[in-house]
């Protein structure tokens, strides 16, 4: 019996079904040498293996449910990400070989333009002119005190000096009128507060006078003493070393000293042999250590043959004194009559330099 002939549509369906089966077989069976992508994705690398439990073998767990291919392709394994972070944590900034002393320099860009100015603050308080004048007076008083400290110390005796006289009106400006205050201020500003180079400061000086009359016998060498410091304008004393009782001045420092002595001498009773002879004379000396013959001394000689009953004899000069050496005034009466040195005769010294 002849087979029944199938229609053409059925034959086309069979051909299509065979092609689909062949294509499915080719895609599902990979090549023998090629590794499976799903297996490579499923198995972690050797270094990242987790410890296996007692129920797992070396080949893997006994049964693992299959995961969808599309979900596996788009997911990230947290364990793999953590292991990658651990391996990369000792590189870059956290590297062990990086020097701790060298800090990473931050690179900034170019500075931008300045911003707009801020708002203006509130106006300050209104200060009256009287307050400004009072504050200015306080500033001037401070400048005056600073100038007084810069000035040399005043002498023990004598006036306060021209500087103190010029500054005295300024200290009394509190009770004066405004016109007087302005005048004093202008006078103070006219005098420079910081003058130029000054003369060197005198560290040692004195001027003393004989307190009472001193009798000098004939043919005698007498050392004068018992002085006092005059309380008069122009008198001075600076530094230690003067013994008013003994009349000796001890040098406080070694240096060159300008010494001077002026004596007012009165003749006593006339000599028994008649008027003074030409060889009768007086010697006024300023000696070191009371050794007029051995040490250097200042000397003045005066004859008595033509002198009056009251006369003056002076001596001055410069001597170099070591520290601690003293000087004093001597009168050598080389005449046949006694003499009287009147009170008020003076002795002075000034340290010139070292």
UniProtKB/Swiss-Prot annotation:
Site (Required for correct protein folding in the endoplasmic reticulum): 333
Function: Iron-regulatory hormone that acts as an erythroid regulator after hemorrhage: produced by erythroblasts following blood loss and mediates suppression of hepcidin (HAMP) expression in the liver, thereby promoting increased iron absorption and mobilization from stores. Promotes lipid uptake into adipocytes and hepatocytes via transcriptional up-regulation of genes involved in fatty acid uptake. Inhibits apoptosis and inflammatory response in cardiomyocytes via promotion of sphingosine-1-phosphate (S1P) and cAMP-dependent activation of AKT signaling.
Organism: Homo sapiens
First and last residue of the signal peptide: 1-28
Ranges for domain C1q: 199-354
Post-translational modification: N-glycosylated; required for secretion of the mature protein.
Modified sites of kind Hydroxyproline: 111, 113-114, 116-117, 119
Taxonomic lineage from the root: Eukaryota, Metazoa, Chordata, Craniata, Vertebrata
Start-end of Low complexity biased regions: 26-37, 51-62
Keywords, in A-Z order: Disulfide bond, Glycoprotein, Hormone, Hydroxylation, Secreted, Signal
Domain of life where this protein originates: Eukaryota
Protein family (similarity comment): Belongs to the adipolin/erythroferrone family.
GO cellular component: extracellular region; extracellular space
Record keyword Signal present: yes
Subunit structure: Homodimer; disulfide-linked. Forms trimer, hexamers and higher molecular weight oligomers. May form heteromeric complexes with C1QTNF2 and C1QTNF12 and, to a lesser extent, with C1QTNF5 and C1QTNF10. Interacts with BMP5 and BMP7; the interaction inhibits BMP-induced transcription of HAMP. Interacts with BMP6; the interaction inhibits BMP-induced transcription of HAMP. Interacts with BMP2. Interacts with heterodimers composed of BMP2 and BMP6 in vitro, the interaction inhibits the heterodimer binding to its receptor BMPR1A /ALK3 and thereby suppresses expression of HAMP.
Molecular functions (GO terms): hormone activity; identical protein binding; molecular sequestering activity
Region feature Disordered, mapped onto this chain: 26-123
Feature: compositional bias, Basic residues: 94-107
Ranges annotated as biased composition (Basic and acidic residues): 69-80
InterPro entries attached to this UniProt entry: Adipolin/Erythroferrone-rel, C1q_dom, Tumour_necrosis_fac-like_dom
Stated name of the protein: Erythroferrone
Compositional bias segments (type: Pro residues): 111-123
Glycosylation sites: 243, 295, 333
């Amino acid at each position: 019996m002849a087979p029944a002939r199938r229609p053409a549509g059925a034959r086309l369906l069979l051909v299509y079904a065979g092609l689909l089966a062949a294509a499915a077989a080719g895609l599902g069976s990979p090549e023998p040498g090629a590794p499976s992508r799903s297996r490579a994705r499923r198995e972690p690398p050797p270094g990242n293996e987790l410890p296996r439990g007692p129920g797992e073998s070396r080949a893997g767990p006994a049964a693992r449910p299959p995961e969808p291919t599309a979900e596996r392709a788009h997911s990230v394994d947290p364990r793999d990400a953590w292991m990658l972070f651990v391996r990369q944590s000792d590189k870059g900034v956290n590297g062990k070989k990086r020097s701790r002393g060298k800090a990473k320099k931050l690179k900034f860009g170019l500075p931008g333009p300045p911003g707009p100015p801020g708002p203006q603050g509130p106006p300050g308080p209104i200060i009256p002119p009287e307050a400004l004048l009072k504050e200015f007076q306080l500033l001037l008083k401070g400048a005056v005190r600073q100038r007084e400290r810069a000035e040399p110390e005043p002498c023990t005796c004598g006036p306060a000096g021209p500087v103190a006289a010029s500054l005295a009106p300024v200290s009394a400006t509190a009770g004066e009128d405004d016109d007087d205050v302005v005048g004093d201020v202008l006078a103070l500003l006219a005098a420079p507060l910081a003058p130029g180079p000054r003369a060197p400061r005198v560290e040692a000086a004195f001027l003393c006078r004989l307190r009472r009359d001193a009798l000098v016998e004939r043919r005698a060498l007498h050392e004068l003493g018992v002085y006092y410091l005059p309380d008069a304008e122009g008198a001075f004393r600076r530094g230690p070393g003067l013994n008013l009782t003994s009349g000796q001045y001890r040098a406080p420092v070694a240096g060159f000293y300008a010494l001077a002595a002026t004596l007012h001498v009165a003749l006593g009773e006339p000599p028994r042999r008649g008027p003074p002879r030409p060889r009768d004379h007086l010697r006024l000396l300023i000696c070191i250590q009371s050794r007029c013959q051995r040490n250097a001394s200042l000397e003045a000689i005066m004859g008595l043959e033509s002198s009056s009953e009251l006369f003056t004899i002076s001596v001055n000069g410069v001597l170099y004194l070591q520290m601690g050496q003293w000087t004093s005034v001597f009168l050598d009466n080389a005449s046949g009559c006694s003499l009287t040195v009147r009170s008020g005769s003076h002795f002075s010294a000034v340290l010139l330099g070292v």
